């Protein structure tokens, strides 16, 4: 498939009917939104305009983005702003832990912008948040969705020593598309990170996610899954890429729900322990359910 990834000035392609979903509304959602706004926290659910956010909240799951809302990289698919970085907030860990308590979360996902400007890539910030949640919410499961830490495996070990329940690092797309979609990232480095997690923490549940519709070919997907399984990755999520603004990469195609179902079945046959595949699937979608499946499959 031809792939026109040049900076575009045309309007975004209209969504097919299966991708039209209203953003959440109603008193319960407003209660949660007000609570999060009052805490001064950033959730990926709201920052990325995720259509699943209220569904996840109702299932006791939320994703918090730490270390600010500006990234040192400028991935062409991502809605997170690129620009000046603030110093990490020393009170952030306690505020996240408080929000987990107030929301009554059973499962908390902690992610971050990429902070190449910090010596440890923000590893110590992840640790502080994990420890604060565990102190106030000992029964809450914790998943960390981490950047590649610029290949700093000492920083990775710092996070692993805090013993999150799931270590997630998104491969995002096939290697051919990295130069246009993920400048500053390296496909092999992401695979190596997942391998390092397995080597350093053999019992850790590992996870990755991909966006479809950027111009990848089916055979490239299969090859990427094989690379992920050779890196001993347990869980795979796949969802439709949606162009955040006209300045981001164009959607090359909309993958139909039936094809997502088929691809999910093929991925499971590659021996992933759990797979979520669908147009609205995002990295933390049904996160607790996928973790439970993987945990059960490993026994």
Swiss-Prot record:
UniProt main location, coarse: cytoplasm
GO cellular component terms, A-Z: cytoplasm
Residue numbers binding [4Fe-4S] cluster 2: 71, 75, 78
Pathway note: Protein modification; protein lipoylation via endogenous pathway; protein N(6)-(lipoyl)lysine from octanoyl-[acyl-carrier-protein]: step 2/2
Boundaries of every Radical SAM core domain copy: 57-273
Keyword entries, A-Z: 4Fe-4S, Cytoplasm, Iron, Iron-sulfur, Metal-binding, S-adenosyl-L-methionine, Transferase
Binding locations of [4Fe-4S] cluster 1: 45, 50, 56, 284
Name of the protein in its database record: Lipoyl synthase
Origin organism lineage: Bacteria, Pseudomonadati, Thermodesulfobacteriota, Desulfobulbia, Desulfobulbales
């Amino acid at each position: 498939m031809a792939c026109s990834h040049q900076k575009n000035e045309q309007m975004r392609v209209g969504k097919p009917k299966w991708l039209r979903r209203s953003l959440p509304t109603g008193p319960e959602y407003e209660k949660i939104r007000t609570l999060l706004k009052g805490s001064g926290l950033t959730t990926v659910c709201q920052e990325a305009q995720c259509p699943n956010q209220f569904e996840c909240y109702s299932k006791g799951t939320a994703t918090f983005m730490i270390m600010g809302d500006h990234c040192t990289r400028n991935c062409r698919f991502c809605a997170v702003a690129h620009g000046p970085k603030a110093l990490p907030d020393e009170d952030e860990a306690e505020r996240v832990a408080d929000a987990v308590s107030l929301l009554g979360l059973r499962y908390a996902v902690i992610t971050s912008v990429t902070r190449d400007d910090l010596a440890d890539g923000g590893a110590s910030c992840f640790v502080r948040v994990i420890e604060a949640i565990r102190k106030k919410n000992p029964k809450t499961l914790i998943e960390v969705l981490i950047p590649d830490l610029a290949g700093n495996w000492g920083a990775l070990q710092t996070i692993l020593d805090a013993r999150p329940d799931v270590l997630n690092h998104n491969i995002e797309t096939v290697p051919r598309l990295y130069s246009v979609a993920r400048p500053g990232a390296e496909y092999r480095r992401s695979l190596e990170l997942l391998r390092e997690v397995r080597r350093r923490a053999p019992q850790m549940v590992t996870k990755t996610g991909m966006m479809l519709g950027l111009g990848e070919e089916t055979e490239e997907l299969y090859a990427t899954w094989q690379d992920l399984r050779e890196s001993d990755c347990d869980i795979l999520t796949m969802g439709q890429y949606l162009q955040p603004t006209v300045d981001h990469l164009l959607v090359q195609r909309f993958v139909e729900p039936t094809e997502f179902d088929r691809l999910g079945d093929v991925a499971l046959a590659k021996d992933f322990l759990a797979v979520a595949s669908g147009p609205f699937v995002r990295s933390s979608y049904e996160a607790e359910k996928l973790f439970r499946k993987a945990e059960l499959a490993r026994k």
